Amino acid sequence: MPWRDNQDPYRIWISEIMLQQTRVETVLPYFINFISRYASVQALAGANEQDVMKLWEGLGYYARARNLIRGALRVVEHFKGKIPCTYKELCSIPGIGDYTAGAILSIAFNMPVPAVDGNVLRVIARLYAVEKDVTKLNVKSEIRALVSSIIPDGHASSFNQGLMELGAMICTPKSPKCNICPWYLICVSRILNLQYRLPLKTPKKPVQVVRRIIAVIFDGQRVLVHKRPSKGLLGGLWEFPGWEFAEDQKQSITNKLLQIGIITHKVLPIIEVQHTFTHLCWNMSGFLCITDASIVKVEENHEYRWVLPEELHDLPFPVAFKQFVLWAIESLPGFIHPVDL
């Protein structure tokens, strides 16, 4: 992996943040592009947030990107531009928690500190046949202690990386390859035939399905985009204006747009898009809402902006809106002026 070409704590920090809730094959191109653009903590500390978000576009969990900028600023301002090598100092950096601190300390500095991610939780729960809910904090603490007890002196970096790889490639969630596992003879769950039942986890909550209206508002030349609040789902990213829609409380799109100062001439259905997050599913119905620039009352500010269709590519949009962005870029230039429609 490119982040393991050396023991640079900055590269390890970036990679570990990117790998949170994200597959390795997805992260690879993003990591290469990110490091090419921001090769040092100083470069990241001086970055424009929107540029970083654009580079992160499609990777998801966008708070990670904002925390990286905040973290880089803290490293530059409080640690003279050097990634600290103590657990307490690392955990004072935004976005760095128990696992990431352990990964940086063990991999970059070869310190005997456990780095317990989902893969390691699974491996250790099976190795010792831990028949407890591994999502509980006290159980995670127990597993951290078990990992600490088996880290070989002077080999924390290679051991922790090997443990992660073991979980990713051999001790997998549904089909563990016990016959080629180096711990085949001593794995308690294999001996007791529990490897397919462990680790124990609290069942996930069902995904909530939400219907949304997405308004692609076009004045004959430009399209209106909205910047989401910095905190919360898809924070700080751009979108087309939208809202939740319930069958039992219909409100016309025309009246809804009037609330933000948009008077529409025509409302035309365009595309249907479904996007699933970890805990949420959006069923989105898109509508082209045609207005006239001369009667638009909405003012540009930090939340709203009028842009040309071809400029949409320059803004960081979440994957959920990609199909709407592509539709707008490909279709809107073909429309003349709303009065001609």
Short names for language-model regions:
Residues 1, 5, 168-341:
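Intrinsically disordered, low-complexity, charged terminal extensions of DNA damage-control enzymes
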Residues 1-179, 183-196, 263:
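Catalytic cores of DNA base-excision repair glycosylases
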